[in-house]
């Protein structure tokens, strides 16, 4: 009887640990010196979070440590633009189901930084549109990785006139040589950068997607199998 009770206690303890919510996760000093590894069906990517966006950094670390992202799909994929994930409703979602409205039940205040822009490989927070979200607050969990495309000076000149913005010279050079999505700058919070796995980004971005009600969802599911913190490689 004592053995049975002890085993039951172990099972309950393990189950409670697995069910830990992001709000219950405690960050340690060493967590801030770790990178985030995303193991997907299409390969592994490694993200380095920005210390310039502490609200988004801490939230992302807590979600990763809690296992929140394990099993979620890349539910919105647009070639030469971005790949989006982080919707908890995508876990186990049947084929054809429209996705993109799931969240942990909270948003994060925008953290726009001039030095963080939408070059290829950046990690940025998804959000609802300006009509219902004029403060541009970020989704609590959904994020995207920019693939983008290369822009000419002429294309950026046109964008500047239409948006009444100025793209700094150093960022222009990046958009011309590396690529990205400059029209998103200072509209969506950038909070990290892909440091390994750019070929995985390109592979996912090139996958065939739906044109039905679940528009832009990959026809064959691509998921984050496991998200975890890993030691930084120098």
Language model features: what each stretch is:
Residues 4-13:
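Sec-dependent N-terminal signal peptides
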């Amino acid at each position: 009887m004592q053995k049975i009770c002890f085993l039951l206690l172990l099972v309950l303890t393990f189950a409670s640990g697995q069910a830990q919510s992001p709000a219950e996760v405690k960050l340690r000093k060493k967590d801030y010196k770790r990178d985030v590894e995303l193991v997907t069906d299409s390969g592994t990517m490694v993200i380095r979070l920005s210390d310039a966006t502490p609200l988004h950094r801490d939230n992302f670390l807590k979600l990763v440590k809690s296992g929140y992202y394990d099993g979620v799909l890349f539910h919105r994929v647009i070639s030469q633009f971005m790949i989006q994930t982080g919707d908890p409703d995508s876990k186990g979602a049947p084929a054809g189901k429209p996705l993109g409205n799931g969240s942990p039940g909270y948003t994060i205040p925008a953290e726009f930084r001039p030095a963080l822009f939408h070059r290829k490989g950046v990690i940025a927070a998804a959000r609802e549109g300006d009509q219902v979200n004029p403060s541009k607050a970020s989704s609590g969990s959904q994020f995207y990785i920019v693939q983008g495309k290369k822009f000419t000076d002429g294309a950026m000149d046109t964008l500047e006139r239409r948006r009444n913005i100025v793209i700094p010279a150093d960022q222009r050079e990046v958009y011309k040589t590396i690529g990205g999505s400059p029209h998103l700058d200072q509209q969506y919070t950038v909070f990290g950068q892909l440091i390994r796995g750019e070929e995985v980004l390109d592979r996912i971005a090139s996958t065939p997607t739906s044109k039905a009600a679940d528009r832009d969802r990959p026809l064959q599911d691509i998921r984050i199998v496991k998200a975890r913190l890993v030691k930084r490689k120098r």
